[in-house]
């Protein structure tokens, strides 16, 4: 008995150490519970099984310490009664033997087989395992006998997998493009993607070509639709007629010139239906570029009533800075002549442009005129010298008769 108790104590101590080691491992795995869910469940089930075995062993020890269970004695009559026959006695003895054998078998199975795990050992699978089903819960049942009614196969859409594209069991979602294709193309695509046992397998290049052609057709159709929608919204370009330009000039004159007026003010004064600020702005910019020349500035200032700018203080003549009091007067006279001519020709042209004519002062002459003047002076000098010579000769001839006459008078 002492040896049995020592063995039991040693086995209990080893089981307790093993249980402590398992709990330590479970604490280590609990840190990585999301990465190792199956390991955590296995260790937990093992710990629960060891605890149940230890509890069962402790209950058996307490029963063995108390002593053997009481045996219920069967009271068998020593003398058979007269009412029981020999066959009934044999059947009762056989039943008693069978019941005894059943009890012995149950006790042997109880000691040999481990106790069933408690209901706490059954853990619920985690949420992330429930969301993605990695196993099949129902085993496929093979029909023992063929069913008399044939099952109707559901229409399945053929799927063509591309081996070049990355990705395993999870394929990216793509919209179906079969609805946009005509009937002939859908049938051709279906026949190329469906793979039979005896037919050839379609290549990935064919499927890619089909998809590229479909995309090109879709893009062309979308571009045509956009062009058809954008064309009716285009506004025709504004054509500035002479009457419209005349109103534009009148508005500028009322507002004080092109550099003061704004497109909004011009449009309000013109009072033309359909005329926008952008159109007036573009026309005003063109008008400013057109009238940026020196003569045009003088004309616009005179038309708007603004005094003309003062005359320049120096004028370059032959690479020499000369103060031009006479040039300023000549330029002002020429400008007045041009303005008068512009007023006379206003009815003929809407916006005439005149270029100023440079005039030299009275005392200054160009180089060619200087040469001509010098030549004329030389010619005059030459003619003057010849006249003097002829005059001297005439004086000599006239003096000689006088001398002769005087000599004649003296001689007489």
From Swiss-Prot:
Cited InterPro entries: Homeodomain-like_sf (IPR009057), HRS1-like (IPR044787), Myb_dom (IPR017930), Myb_dom_plants (IPR006447), SANT/Myb (IPR001005)
Keyword set includes DNA-binding: yes
The entry's keywords: DNA-binding, Nucleus, Transcription, Transcription regulation
BP terms from Gene Ontology: negative regulation of DNA-templated transcription
Domain of life: Eukaryota
Localization, UniProt: Nucleus
DNA-binding region (UniProt annotation): 263-288
Listed Low complexity bias regions: 183-193, 395-412
UniProt-recorded Gene Ontology molecular function terms: DNA-binding transcription factor activity; sequence-specific DNA binding
One Gene Ontology cellular component annotation held by this UniProt entry: nucleus
Span list, region Disordered: 54-241, 286-310, 358-412
Basic and acidic residues composition bias: residue spans: 90-112, 198-228, 383-392
Record domain HTH myb-type: where: 232-292
Description of what induces expression: Induced by nitrate.
Function: Transcriptional repressor that may play a role in response to nitrogen. May be involved in a time-dependent signaling for transcriptional regulation of nitrate-responsive genes. Binds specifically to the DNA sequence motif 5'-GAATC-3' or 5'-GAATATTC-3'. Represses the activity of its own promoter trough binding to these motifs.
Protein name as catalogued: Transcription factor NIGT1
Gene: NIGT1
């Amino acid at each position: 008995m002492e040896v049995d108790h020592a063995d039991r104590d040693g086995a209990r101590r080893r089981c307790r150490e093993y249980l402590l080691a398992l709990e330590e491992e479970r604490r280590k795995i609990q840190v990585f519970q999301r990465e190792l869910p199956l390991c955590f469940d296995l260790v937990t089930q093992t710990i629960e099984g060891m605890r149940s075995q230890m509890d069962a062993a402790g209950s058996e020890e307490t029963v063995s310490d108390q002593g053997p269970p009481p045996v219920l004695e069967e009271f068998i009559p020593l003398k058979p009664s007269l009412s029981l026959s020999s066959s009934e006695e044999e059947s009762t003895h056989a039943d008693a033997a069978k019941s005894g054998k059943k009890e012995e078998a149950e006790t042997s199975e109880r000691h040999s087989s481990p106790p069933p795990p408690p209901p706490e050992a059954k853990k619920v699978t985690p949420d992330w395992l429930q969301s993605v089903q990695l196993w099949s819960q129902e085993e496929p049942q093979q029909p023992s006998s063929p069913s008399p009614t044939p099952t109707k196969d559901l229409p399945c859409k053929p799927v063509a997998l591309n081996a070049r594209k990355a990705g395993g069991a999870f394929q990216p979602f793509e919209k179906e493009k079969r609805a946009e294709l005509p009937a002939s193309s859908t049938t051709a695509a279906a026949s190329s993607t469906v793979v039979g046992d005896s037919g050839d397998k379609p290549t990935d290049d064919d499927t890619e070509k089909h998809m590229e052609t479909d995309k090109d057709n879709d893009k062309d159709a979308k571009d045509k639709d956009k062009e058809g929608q954008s064309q009716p919204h285009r506004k025709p370009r504004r054509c500035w007629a002479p009457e419209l330009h005349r109103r534009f000039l009148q508005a500028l004159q009322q507002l004080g010139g092109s550099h003061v007026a704004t497109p909004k003010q011009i449009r309000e004064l013109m009072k033309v239906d359909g005329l926008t600020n952008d159109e007036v702005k573009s026309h005003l910019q063109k008008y400013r570029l057109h009238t940026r020349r020196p003569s045009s500035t003088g004309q616009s200032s005179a038309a708007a009533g603004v005094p003309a700018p003062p005359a320049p203080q120096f004028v370059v003549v032959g690479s020499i800075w000369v103060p031009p009091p006479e040039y300023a007067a000549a330029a002002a006279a020429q400008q007045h002549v041009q303005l008068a001519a512009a007023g006379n020709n206003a009815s003929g042209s809407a916006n005439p442009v005149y270029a100023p004519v440079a005039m030299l002062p009275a005392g200054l002459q160009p180089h060619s005129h200087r040469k001509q003047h010098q030549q004329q002076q030389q010619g005059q000098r030459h003619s003057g010298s010849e006249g003097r010579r002829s005059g001297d000769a005439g004086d000599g001839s006239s003096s000689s008769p006088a001398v002769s006459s005087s000599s004649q008078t003296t001689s007489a």
